[in-house]
Design a protein with these regions (language model features):
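Short beta-edge/loop segments at beta->alpha junctions of small alpha/beta modules
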Residues: 1-74
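Nucleic-acid-binding surface
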Residues: 59-193
Length: 193
């Protein structure tokens, strides 16, 4: 594959961020050394933007949520990012929050990415998880449950849009009595306010 054809394949994609493995698949390339050389050429000539080892963007205007989901896999966007996007909290933490298999903080292009550890049985369960615009994100109900599971005391501003039945139906995947209590307390508090 010529240099220009390889770049054109990337530029035609609806994705803005690519892992090295995704580029290999996109190009149908089996020679990793050759692919790495092409990618390095694109980076040196400013045609690809390096984000992190093995992760590249078309340019500096990449989708940050898409990048977030490629840093650690498996992971999904949740917690305060989803709560703020859905209007459940008014204070938005400027971090992009995800859950994954380890707790980490990462900074790239002046954007903080915060990863919170959650047990594998929850992380790999697809209930309330949505594939959206080249990234994976929790529904507002799943984000509420993740937050109640990970944080002992958390203040929510507006729970009017929550489907409580979905929350109670999904809560079993956490297998956690403290979460069950926090969910019930949060529901009771909302119901009587």
């Amino acid at each position: 594959m010529s240099h220009q054809k390889g770049l054109d394949t990337i530029l035609r994609s609806d994705k803005t961020v690519f892992s090295f493995r995704e580029i290999l698949i996109l190009w149908g390339e089996t020679n990793a050394k050759l692919a790495k050389a092409k990618i390095n050429y694109y980076v040196k000539t400013g045609q690809l933007y390096p984000l992190r080892k093995g992760i590249y963007a078309k340019d500096k205007n990449y989708e940050k949520l898409e990048f977030a989901g490629k840093i650690f896999k498996p992971s999904y966007i949740s917690l305060e990012t989803v709560l703020a996007l859905e209007g459940l909290i008014s204070h938005q933490n400027k971090n992009i929050s995800l859950v994954t298999y380890q707790t980490r903080h990462f900074l790239c292009d002046k954007q903080n990415y915060e990863f919170k550890k959650i047990k594998n049985s929850v992380l790999t369960n697809s209930l309330g998880i949505i594939q959206k615009n080249n990234y994976v994100i929790a529904s507002k109900e799943r984000a509420l449950l993740d937050t109640l599971y990970l944080y002992k005391d958390y203040h929510f501003d507006n729970l009017n849009s929550i489907d409580w039945e979905k929350c109670f139906d999904m809560s079993y995947i956490y297998k956690n009595k403290n979460l069950e209590k926090r969910l019930y307390t949060t529901y009771e508090s909302f119901k009587y306010n």
